[in-house]
Amino acid sequence: MEGWRISHLNEHKHERTIYVDADACPVKDEILSVASQFQIPVTFIASYEHFQTKRSPLEDWRFVDTHKEAADLVIANSVAAHDIVVTQDIGLASLLLPRQVIVLSERGRMYTNETIDFDLERRHVSSKQRRKGVYGKGPKKLLEEDKKRFIAQLQKILSNHEGFLN
């Protein structure tokens, strides 16, 4: 009976997944490439306006309404500890970090518990400036070196968490 209980519990073990806030994500192909190296499933969350078909057996697409927080809510309700989320949304990152989710920007920057308060403060200051009519240049164009940094960081995360060596 004891052996049954152990195997029964193992059947319900969570499989690590990469979730992608996909509407404006410029590194979808890079995510799929790295995920295939590690055989990690990827779930892309996007609005119906960004409908895509599946290109790999490791990928899954979930489509949501066009409401600006719809994808964030699906991601927040789907993730488990040690899953990986790729997003540029600092607010979403701040919700996921306390749940032991690994959060990575599209440029390869990891959001951490140590840096998230600063990121939120910077976002707040920028928002106040925009309300006053002061607009910055916006984000810099994503360069090939940014994509390489992202790939290296995702490979490092998966290597460390899957027991592989760099």
Curated annotation (Swiss-Prot):
Superkingdom as given in the UniProt entry: Bacteria
UniProt-listed Pfam families: DUF188
HAMAP family recorded: UPF0178
Family to which the UniProt record says this protein belongs: Belongs to the UPF0178 family.
Database matches in PANTHER family: UPF0178 PROTEIN YAII
Protein name (database record): UPF0178 protein BPUM_2255
